[in-house]
């Protein structure tokens, strides 16, 4: 800090003006000194003077508590890394599998549409649509289950080298079971029935609300009466040092697994046990019967996370609900989707012409004019979506009484699911997020209670979700980054209840926060990234909260007040107007970019129809493949175009700085959705490279997200698990900070791990699941770090790692 000699009793943050980045560098320097004990960021926050810190690290380590995690059994020697021929062969086989499945879908679809089109009259077409829809749905649901049992049989604890032939089988099964239409029935008895069909041992009266479907289902055991809430990971596998490791996850009877949790392989919860939100069980951790744990890694607590009591929800109710869901799909949704295309072709001769032999509409320039005109209907989706959201869900919400306990799988449950589905539209939230428009969208369209709004132009980010918007309150002057999940509905295995979730005024919320309705925070709080919001104890006010379980830190530091003079007066009005103009242009670009892709897909469909008589179903299959591949190329070009004139660089500026507005444009205009289909394939590395990531050879990426691609460096042979994030920026109140992060060769990021900006991980380092590696941290080579905030938990890893 350049402060020279200071008193040993001076406060790091209050007196010396330090911040978390400075103290992370301080901790890294201390760890390099062999004559000094290791210190972590948590030690610094809890002991914010030199005297207090020295006394804390000099004290003898306390005896391990009774609930300390059980160390995992020693792993077998890791297989040797795959060579280049295996890497190339794996990618080729994955591409062939994708094309083959696309052909199967095209074959079934074209046969079905031909048969439906031969119907006479509307009713006959409808009946044929229902029959074809039923058969098609049965095939799409059954194929992944059949493939799993044929290629794998029963999953067993094992190690699978990535890019090997065994891994190709693993990838095929993982991809198919996660794209099965039955996944759409999450929160329904049909979902647990699907898990049973895949080999999972699921007890009676179990409710699963997480869309993160487990893959190695034979290794999953869930006892009677257990509830697994949304955004939880319990995949029964993980990737580590270039190897897929499968292992058991065991949940006893009447277990509660709260929102945004991670259950690593080899973890378990006993009968009646509870795991709090934003928590994780690492490999080897076992929660005894009846105990409550929370944190990352979890530790014992007295907090009760069973927020709602039971209700009558017997087998008859579950059966009727499942039957009604299937009937709705077969009698309404599928006929609309299948028969609607036939009706469209029948009523639009200019489109029907492309199916006729000989000269077709594709040779007429007016066809393309009509195609462009038809594609302009894309823009009508925005006002229609806003009108629908402002009316239908609001009317439905009147049927549900806050605070009242309702049984699952009844009328009120169905209404609540419709409200949650229709008001959480990512397209619109991303459109209005990071702009002044977001507060009007949330308040007027969705029904949020935002008190008296203090417009900043960045009140909310582009990612936000809730259970119901009508019971979501955010106080005056509060700013929210991306990834906030407002949990204002509590679920048991038989019941649910909605209640108001209130975030106080003058708060700042970081990224990836799950905020429960029982949250105990009030005015003027800083909620750090991935913090576990407390639901017990006093109301926290005027403090910051960090970690899981959370502990208090300073609400703000000197560095974050650098641009406070811009927050008021005439200067604010002038800068806010300029920001609004820039954000409006960004929103227009967002819509135009997606409209152009929509137009391109429309033309591809037309060309496929033109060539159908010549090539048959292969035309449709290749058209589907081209939609995916050309979409990737298109959005890579969009990404590069946005940053062509203004490349991403480390920043320290106000949110009213033009450089920050350009960064907001970079976050909004490109798309990342297309990346999902490339997870676990060599093609993901190619795309990262095209997007500007400095990435090494044979990196295994199972679903990592990089917010600022060109600021990230990833070394050879790294392993990036699903749900992991490398975010090269941070924002506290009105101050924006950004820097580069480096993940050296052979590193592993666990499931749900979060890496902040300015971080350097040494060769072969491991970051445990659900960990938060804070800004500026330096992880030594081959070290094992974990926790929230992360700290060193072990030395050189036992595996061979990257060679």
Model-derived segments and spans:
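Phosphopantetheine-dependent thiolation modules in NRPS/PKS and related acyl-activating systems
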Residues: 1-78
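Residue-level signal for pocket-adjacent positions within structured domains
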Residues: 1-2, 7-8, 39-40, 176, ...
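Conserved structural-core and active-site-/substrate-pathway-adjacent residues in large, well-folded domains
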Residues: 16-19, 30, 53, 99, ...
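Terminal amphipathic alpha-helical/low-complexity segments used for targeting or macromolecular assembly
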Residues: 73-200, 288-447, 540-692, 781-803
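Short amphipathic alpha-helical segments with coiled-coil-like heptad repeat character
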Residues: 107-110, 338, 515, 533, ...
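Glycine-rich hexapeptide-repeat left-handed beta-helix
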Residues: 144, 221, 227-334, 469-589, ...
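Left-handed beta-helix
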Residues: 168-254, 258-267, 282, 395-506, ...
């Amino acid at each position: 800090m350049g402060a020279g000699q200071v008193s040993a009793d001076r406060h790091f943050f209050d007196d010396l003006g330090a911040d978390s980045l400075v103290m992370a560098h301080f901790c890294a320097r201390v760890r390099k000194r062999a004559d000094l004990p290791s210190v972590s960021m948590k030690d610094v926050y809890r002991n914010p003077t030199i005297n207090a810190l020295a006394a804390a690290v000099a004290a003898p380590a306390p005896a391990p508590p009774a609930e300390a995690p059980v160390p995992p059994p020693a792993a077998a020697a890791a297989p040797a890394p795959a060579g280049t021929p295996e890497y190339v062969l794996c990618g080729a086989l994955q591409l062939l599998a994708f094309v083959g499945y696309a052909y199967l879908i095209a074959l079934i679809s074209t046969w079905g549409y031909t048969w439906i089109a031969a119907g006479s009259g509307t009713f006959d077409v409808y009946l044929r649509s229902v029959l074809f829809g039923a058969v098609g749905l049965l095939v799409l649901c059954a194929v992944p289950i059949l493939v799993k049992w044929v290629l794998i049989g029963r999953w067993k604890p094992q190690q699978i080298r990535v890019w090997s032939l065994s891994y190709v089988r693993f990838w095929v099964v993982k991809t198919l079971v996660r794209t099965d239409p039955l996944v759409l029935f999450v929160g329904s008895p049909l979902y647990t029935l699907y898990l049973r069909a895949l080999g999972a041992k699921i007890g009676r009266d179990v409710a699963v609300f997480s869309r993160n479907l487990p893959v190695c289902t034979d290794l999953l055991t869930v006892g009677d009466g257990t509830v697994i809430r949304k955004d939880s990971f319990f995949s029964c596998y993980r990737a580590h040092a270039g190897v897929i490791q499968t292992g058991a996850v065991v949940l006893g009877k009447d277990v509660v697994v709260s929102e945004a949790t991670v259950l690593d392989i080899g973890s378990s919860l006993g009968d009646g046990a509870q795991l709090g939100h934003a928590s994780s069980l690492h490999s080897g951790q076992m929660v005894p019967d009846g105990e409550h744990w929370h944190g990352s890694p979890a530790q014992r607590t007295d907090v009760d996370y069973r927020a709602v009591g039971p209700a009558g929800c017997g087998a008859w109710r579950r059966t009727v609900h499942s039957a009604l869901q299937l009937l709705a799909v077969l009698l309404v949704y599928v006929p609309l989707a299948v028969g609607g295309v036939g009706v469209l072709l029948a009523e639009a001769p200019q489109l029907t012409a492309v199916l006729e032999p000989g000269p077709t509409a594709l040779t007429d320039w007016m066809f393309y004019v009509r195609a462009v005109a038809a594609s302009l209907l894309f823009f009508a989706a925005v006002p229609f979506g806003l009108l629908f959201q402002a009316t239908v869900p609001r009317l439905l919400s009147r049927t549900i009484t806050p605070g009242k306990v309702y049984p699952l799988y009844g009328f009120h449950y169905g209404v609540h699911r419709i409200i949650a589905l229709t008001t959480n539209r990512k397209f619109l939230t991303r459109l209005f997020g990071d702009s002044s428009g977001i507060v009007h969208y949330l308040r007027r369209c969705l029904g949020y209670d935002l008190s008296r709004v203090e417009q900043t132009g960045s009140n909310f980010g582009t990612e936000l979700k809730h259970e119901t918007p009508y019971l979501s309150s955010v106080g005056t002057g509060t700013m929210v980054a991306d990834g906030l999940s407002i949990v204002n509905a509590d679920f048991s295995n038989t019941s649910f209840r909605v209640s108001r979730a209130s975030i106080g005024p003058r708060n700042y919320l970081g990224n990836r926060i799950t905020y429960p309705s029982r949250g105990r925070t009030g005015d003027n709080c800083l909620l750090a990234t991935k913090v576990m919001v407390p639901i017990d104890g006093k109301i926290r006010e005027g403090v910051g909260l960090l970690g899981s379980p959370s502990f208090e830190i300073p609400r703000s530091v000197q560095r974050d007040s650098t641009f406070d003079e811009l927050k008021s007066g005439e200067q604010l009005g002038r800068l806010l107007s300029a920001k609004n103009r820039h954000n409006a242009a960004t929103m227009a670009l967002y819509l135009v970019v997606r409209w152009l892709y929509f137009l391109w897909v429309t033309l591809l469909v037309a060309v496929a129809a033109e060539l159908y008589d010549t090539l048959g179903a292969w035309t449709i299959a290749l058209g589907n493949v081209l939609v995916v591949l050309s979409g990737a190329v298109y959005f890579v070009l969009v990404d590069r175009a946005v940053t062509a004139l203004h490349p991403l660089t480390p920043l320290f500026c106000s949110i009213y700085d033009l450089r920050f507005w350009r960064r907001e444009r970079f976050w909004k205009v490109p798309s990342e959705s297309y990346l999902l289909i490339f997870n676990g394939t060599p093609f993901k590395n190619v795309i990262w490279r095209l997007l500007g990531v400095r990435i090494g050879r044979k990196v295994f990426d199972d679903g990592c997200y990089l917010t600022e691609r060109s600021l990230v460096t990833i070394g050879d042979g790294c392993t990036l698990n699903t749900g992991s994030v490398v975010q090269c920026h941070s924002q506290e109140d009105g101050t924006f900070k950004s820097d580069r992060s480096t993940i050296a060769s052979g590193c592993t990021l666990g499931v749900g791990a979060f890496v902040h900006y300015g971080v350097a991980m040494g060769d072969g380092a491991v970051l445990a699941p659900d960990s938060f590696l804070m800004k500026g941290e330096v992880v030594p080579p081959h070290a094992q770090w974990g926790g929230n905030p992360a700290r060193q938990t072990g030395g050189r890893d036992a595996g061979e790692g990257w060679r």
